[in-house]
C-alpha cells in the first residue's frame, strides 16, 4: 500500500505495521518471534545467537555444559528451533550475498501424542496418560447430581421463599433419583447385552 504526500512528492511504503526489532531498534526485516513473544529481525537475532555462542565457547571452553543463547530482552532460552518466522505480503527476497542463512521454518512439534515421552535412548519409552478434563467435569456433575452435595445445592435457592425452596429441592431430589435409576439401568443393559 503506497501513501503519497502531496507536499514534496515522496512516497512512503507501508509494510504492514511499525514493528521494531528489539536489537537494532529499526523496522523489522525478515521478522521472527521468539516463544517468549519478542520480535526481532532474522539477521539481528542470528548474529546475536552466533556471537553469544562464540563468546560463551571461548569463556567456557573447559566447561562441558553449554547453555543455549538467551533472549536479549527477557533472558529466556533462544535457538533456531524456538524461533517462529512471520510471513507477510510484499516482503523482499533475501539477499544472496549475505552470510546470514535463511530464516528457520519454526518449531516442529512431535506428532506422537501427548501421552508418550522418549527417555535417554530410543528403547526406553515411558508412557503416561493425562486424564481428560471433560471426563472429570462429567464425573463431577454426575457425582453432584447423584449424591447431592448440599453446599452447591443451596446456592440457587437463596432468593426464594421457604415453600418454593422446599418444592425446588424436592423436585431436584426426585430428578436425582430418576438419574440414578437411568444410570443403573444403563449399566445393567451394558452388562446383560
UniProtKB/Swiss-Prot annotation:
Transmembrane segments annotated in the record for this chain: 175-192
Annotated PROSITE patterns: ZF_RING_1 (PS00518), ZF_RING_2 (PS50089)
Subcellular location: Endoplasmic reticulum membrane
One GO cellular component term: endoplasmic reticulum
Pathways involved: Protein modification; protein ubiquitination
GO molecular function terms noted in the UniProt entry: ubiquitin protein ligase activity; ubiquitin-protein transferase activity; zinc ion binding
Entry's EC annotation: 2.3.2.27
Alphabetically ordered keywords of this record: Endoplasmic reticulum, Membrane, Metal-binding, Transferase, Transmembrane, Transmembrane helix, Ubl conjugation pathway, Zinc, Zinc-finger
Domain notes: The RING-type zinc finger domain is required for E3 ligase activity.
Official protein name in the record: E3 ubiquitin-protein ligase RMA2
Source species: Arabidopsis thaliana (Mouse-ear cress)
Amino acid at each position: 500500500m503506497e501513501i503519497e504526500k502531496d507536499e514534496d512528492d515522496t512516497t512512503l511504503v507501508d509494510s504492514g505495521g511499525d514493528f521494531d526489532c528489539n536489537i537494532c531498534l529499526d523496522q523489522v526485516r525478515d521478522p521472527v518471534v521468539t516463544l517468549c513473544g519478542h520480535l526481532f529481525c532474522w539477521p539481528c537475532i542470528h548474529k546475536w545467537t552466533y556471537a553469544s555462542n562464540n563468546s560463551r565457547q571461548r569463556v567456557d571452553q573447559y566447561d562441558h555444559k553449554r547453555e543455549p543463547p538467551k533472549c536479549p530482552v527477557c533472558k529466556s532460552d533462544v535457538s533456531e528451533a524456538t524461533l517462529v518466522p512471520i510471513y507477510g505480503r510484499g516482503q523482499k527476497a533475501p539477499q544472496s550475498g549475505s552470510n546470514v542463512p535463511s530464516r528457520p521454518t519454526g518449531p516442529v512439534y512431535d506428532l506422537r501424542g501427548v501421552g508418550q515421552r522418549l527417555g535417554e535412548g530410543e528403547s526406553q519409552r515411558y508412557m503416561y496418560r493425562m486424564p481428560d478434563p471433560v471426563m472429570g467435569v462429567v464425573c463431577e456433575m454426575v457425582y453432584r447430581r447423584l449424591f447431592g452435595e448440599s453446599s452447591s445445592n443451596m446456592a440457587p435457592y437463596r432468593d426464594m421463599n421457604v415453600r418454593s425452596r422446599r418444592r425446588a429441592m424436592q423436585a431436584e431430589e426426585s430428578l436425582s433419583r430418576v438419574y440414578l435409576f437411568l444410570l443403573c439401568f444403563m449399566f445393567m443393559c451394558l452388562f446383560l447385552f
